[in-house]
Every structure is written in C-alpha cells, then in structure tokens.
Amino acid sequence: MKEFNWNEFKKEKIAVHCNTMQGTKDFINKCYENNIDWCDASKSETLSFLCKHYNSNRYFDFDCHSLEWDEKSFYSDRGYKIIEWD
C-alpha cells in the first residue's frame, strides 16, 4: 500500500485486510516500523505462526496499544472501516 494513515489506524475503528501472505508480511513489517507490536507474542513467534497458518480471511486492527486479528464479521458487526492492504 502506497499511502496509509498510521495515526488514523491507531485512533479510529479500522481493520486492515491482506489478500496474500506477502501482503500480510508487508503489513506486519510496516506495523513494526511504526512501533506497533502484538498484544500477546513476540515478533518472531507471530510471523512464524502466520506463515504456517496463513488465512486470507484474517483482518488486523490496533486496540489497547497493540496489534490484534480476527474474522471480518467481528469488525463489520462493530462498525469498523475495512481497508484493503494489497
């Protein structure tokens, strides 16, 4: 993604969807560059998990000062704006 508003992602109800594993890796690495870490795991553990269990139905959000994921229905039911990363 060429332009992404990281401040808006951190402050608003936004979920990000990645269509590919490469897009997922890119998004997560950009999160790290913007000081966004996972809520419950180390960086290496999380990337390893995502590589082994890739799911194109996974959406990411920033909540309670950390990165989390869930299914699309979780976010759409709660009124999140969904942005396509790749």
Question: How should each PLM-predicted stretch be described?
Answer:
Residues 1-86:
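Structural boundary micro-motifs
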